[in-house]
Design a protein with these regions (language model features):
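Alpha-helical transmembrane segments and their immediate juxtamembrane interface regions
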Residues: 104-158
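Lipid-exposed faces of alpha-helical membrane segments in multi-pass integral membrane proteins
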Residues: 4-11, 28-35, 89-100, 129-133, ...
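Alpha-helical transmembrane segments of helical membrane proteins, especially in multi-pass transport
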Residues: 48, 73-106, 138
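Membrane-water interface of alpha-helical transmembrane segments
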Residues: 19-26, 74-81, 85, 117, ...
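Long, highly hydrophobic alpha-helical transmembrane signal-anchor segments
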Residues: 1-39, 111-117
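Membrane-proximal helix-loop-helix units in multi-pass membrane proteins
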Residues: 21-77
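Structural signature of transmembrane alpha-helix termini at the membrane-water interface
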Residues: 11-18, 35-42, 96-107, 136, ...
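Short, highly charged, low-complexity non-transmembrane loops/tails of multi-pass membrane proteins
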Residues: 52-60, 153-164
Length: 164
């Protein structure tokens, strides 16, 4: 995706398209990922369940036995679904912030030296404005999942991890 994004940015500059296309491009990639994550909730394999709650990462058998013992399986599934919604929301936040930042910063005609400088400034500011908050949201989602598993099973963190 990164290579495609760089190619699109270069294409916008070379074709001297309106600078608003930079904002659209900046918002499109995390927006599409957010839609894919959200869309995964209507499949048998929501993204959080596929990526995190799987036998390669966690001791799913042990966790499921504890959830069954405490009759928390349905509530746990609902919380995993909530975590998937939260992850989708984090990508939508990133998409919105990318768009706002690009509209605010990139104002010069495409293909100009000022346009290239603004792209550099956009990249620089995207870290504190978008990347760090998004990373904090992701860590919050992982904490939410861990806290959910711990509170519903009583298992310690070390007991949750899959053994190799």
């Amino acid at each position: 995706l990164g290579l495609v994004s760089v190619g699109i940015t270069g294409g916008i500059g070379l074709l001297q398209l309106d600078q608003q296309w930079i904002a659209v491009k900046e918002a499109a990639i995390p927006g599409l990922i957010g839609l894919a994550v959200l869309g995964s909730t209507w499949t048998r394999y929501p993204l959080i369940k596929t990526l995190l709650y799987n036998p390669n990462t966690l001791d799913v058998g042990r966790i499921q036995r504890k959830l069954d013992e405490t009759s928390n399986s349905a509530l746990f599934e609902a919380r995993l679904l909530n975590a998937t919604y939260m992850l989708s929301g984090a990508f939508f936040f990133s998409s919105l912030m990318n768009y706002i930042l690009a509209v605010w910063i990139v104002t010069s005609p495409t293909g100009s030296a000022a346009f290239n400088e603004e792209l550099g400034r956009l990249t620089l500011l995207s870290y504190p404005v978008i990347a760090i908050p998004s990373a904090l949201m992701m860590m919050g989602i992982f904490y939410y999942i861990w806290r959910t598993i711990h509170s519903m099973t009583g298992l310690a963190f070390e007991d949750l991890l899959a053994s190799r």
